[in-house]
C-alpha cells in the first residue's frame, strides 16, 4: 500500500547544499539510510568532485558535487534541496536555490540573522513564490517509510494516519515516539525563528487535503501569534480532528526561551492565550506533551 504524505515523498530527488561539511556528511548518510533519494550536492569550491556514501542497501555510491543548485537540478532532476551551510553563507545559499526555482527548500541552519531570512523570503515572494521553504532553524520534514529531508531520527516510527507540524524539533521527536505504534503521514518541524517559510497553517491546510492523514497534531510555543492565526484558520477550514500543545506555560514575561521567536510581551503570546484560541476553534489542547499524545491516541482510536 502506498501511503500519501505532504510536501515530500519517496519520489523526490534531493540535493544537499554544503554536502561536504561535517554536519551535512553525517546527515546525508542518515538520510540515505532512511531511503531518501539523494542525487548529489552543491559546493562551488569542490565542484566536479564526488562524495562517497552508503545507500540504503549498504552499497557504496558516489554522489556528484556541483558548482550550483541550477547545475545540480539540470543534471539530476532534483526537486528538493537541503541547506546545511553556516549562518553567514545561508542567505546566499537560499537565494541561489530560489533563483534555480527548486520546488522545496529545507533550511536546517540555526542562527541565521532574522534580517537575512526576511530578505530571502521577500526575494522569494518577488520571484513568484515558486519555492516552498521549510525553516530555518528546524529539523526539516519526514514522511516515514518514504523520505527524510532533514535531521529527524528516521527510526522512531513508520507510516500512519497522523500529520504533525511543530515549532520545536525535540517535541517533534517526542510526539513521534509517544505515538510510534500509530505512525505518521508526514512530520514537519517548521522552526522556532521569528520569520519562517512554512507556517502551521500551510501544513494544516495540506494535511486537511491529504487523504491518508486522519488526525492533525500541532505543536506551538509562546511568542508571536502563529497559533492564534492557526486557530482562526482551523475554525473555518479544517474538518479533521486537531490536537494541540503549546510549549512555555511557565515562561516569565520578556525573556527569550530557547528560540528567538519564543518571547512573551504582556498578555500577548502567552501559552494560556494560545490555548484559549485553539480550544475556541475546537482543538483539543494537552497540558503536557504526553497528555497531548494521549488525547491524539484517544481521538484517533474513536474515529
Curated annotation (Swiss-Prot):
EC number(s) from the headed UniProt entry: 6.2.1.5
Annotated GO biological process: tricarboxylic acid cycle
UniProt-listed InterPro entries: Cit_synth/succinyl-CoA_lig_AS, Citrt_syn/SCS-alpha_CS, CoA-bd, CoA_lig_alpha, NAD(P)-bd_dom_sf, SUCC_ACL_C, Succinyl-CoA_synth-like
Keywords: Ligase, Nucleotide-binding, Tricarboxylic acid cycle
Residues holding substrate: 173
An example Gene Ontology molecular-function term: succinate-CoA ligase (ADP-forming) activity
Name of the top EC class for this enzyme: ligase
Pathway the protein contributes to: Carbohydrate metabolism; tricarboxylic acid cycle; succinate from succinyl-CoA (ligase route): step 1/1
Top-rank taxon, per record: Bacteria
Catalytic activity: succinate + ATP + CoA = succinyl-CoA + ADP + phosphate; GTP + succinate + CoA = succinyl-CoA + GDP + phosphate
Positions with a binding annotation for CoA: 20-23, 46, 108-110
GO cellular component: cytosol; peptidoglycan-based cell wall; plasma membrane; succinate-CoA ligase complex (ADP-forming)
Active site per UniProt: 259
Keyword Ligase: yes
Record SMART domains: CoA_binding
Family assignment from sequence similarity: Belongs to the succinate/malate CoA ligase alpha subunit family.
Oligomeric and partner information: Heterotetramer of two alpha and two beta subunits.
Biological role stated in the UniProt entry: Succinyl-CoA synthetase functions in the citric acid cycle (TCA), coupling the hydrolysis of succinyl-CoA to the synthesis of either ATP or GTP and thus represents the only step of substrate-level phosphorylation in the TCA. The alpha subunit of the enzyme binds the substrates coenzyme A and phosphate, while succinate binding and nucleotide specificity is provided by the beta subunit.
Xref: NCBIfam families: PRK05678.1 (NF004230), sucCoAalpha (TIGR01019)
Name by which UniProt lists this protein: Succinate--CoA ligase [ADP-forming] subunit alpha
Amino acid at each position: 500500500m502506498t501511503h500519501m504524505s505532504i510536501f515530500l515523498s519517496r519520489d523526490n530527488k534531493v540535493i544537499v547544499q554544503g554536502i561536504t561539511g561535517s554536519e551535512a556528511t553525517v546527515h546525508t548518510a542518515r538520510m540515505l539510510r532512511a531511503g531518501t533519494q539523494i542525487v548529489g550536492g552543491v559546493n562551488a569550491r569542490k565542484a566536479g568532485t564526488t562524495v562517497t556514501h552508503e545507500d540504503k542497501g549498504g552499497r557504496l555510491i558516489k554522489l556528484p558535487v556541483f558548482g550550483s543548485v541550477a547545475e545540480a537540478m539540470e543534471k539530476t532532476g532534483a526537486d528538493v534541496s537541503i541547506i546545511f551551510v553556516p549562518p553567514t553563507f545561508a542567505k546566499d545559499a537560499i537565494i541561489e536555490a530560489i533563483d534555480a526555482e527548486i520546488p522545496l527548500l529545507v533550511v536546517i541552519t540555526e542562527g541565521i540573522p532574522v534580517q537575512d531570512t526576511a530578505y530571502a523570503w521577500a526575494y522569494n515572494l518577488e520571484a513568484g513564490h515558486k519555492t516552498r521553504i521549510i525553516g530555518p532553524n528546524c529539523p526539516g520534514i519526514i514522511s516515514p517509510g518514504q523520505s527524510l529531508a532533514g535531521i529527524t531520527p528516521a527510526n522512531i516510527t513508520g507510516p500512519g494516519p497522523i500529520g504533525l507540524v511543530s515549532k520545536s524539533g525535540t517535541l517533534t521527536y517526542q510526539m513521534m515516539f509517544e505515538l510510534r505504534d500509530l505512525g505518521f503521514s508526514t512530520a514537519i518541524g517548521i522552526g522556532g525563528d521569528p520569520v519562517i517559510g512554512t507556517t502551521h497553517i500551510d501544513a494544516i491546510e495540506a494535511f486537511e487535503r491529504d487523504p491518508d492523514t486522519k488526525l492533525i497534531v500541532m505543536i506551538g510555543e509562546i511568542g508571536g501569534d502563529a497559533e492564534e492565526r492557526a486557530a482562526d484558520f482551523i475554525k473555518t477550514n479544517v474538518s479533521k480532528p486537531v490536537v494541540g500543545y503549546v510549549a512555555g506555560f511557565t515562561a516569565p514575561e520578556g525573556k527569550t526561551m530557547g528560540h528567538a521567536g519564543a518571547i512573551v510581551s504582556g498578555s500577548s503570546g502567552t501559552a494560556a492565550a494560545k490555548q484559549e484560541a485553539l480550544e475556541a476553534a475546537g482543538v483539543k489542547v494537552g497540558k503536557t506533551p504526553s497528555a497531548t499524545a494521549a488525547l491524539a491516541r484517544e481521538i484517533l482510536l474513536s474515529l
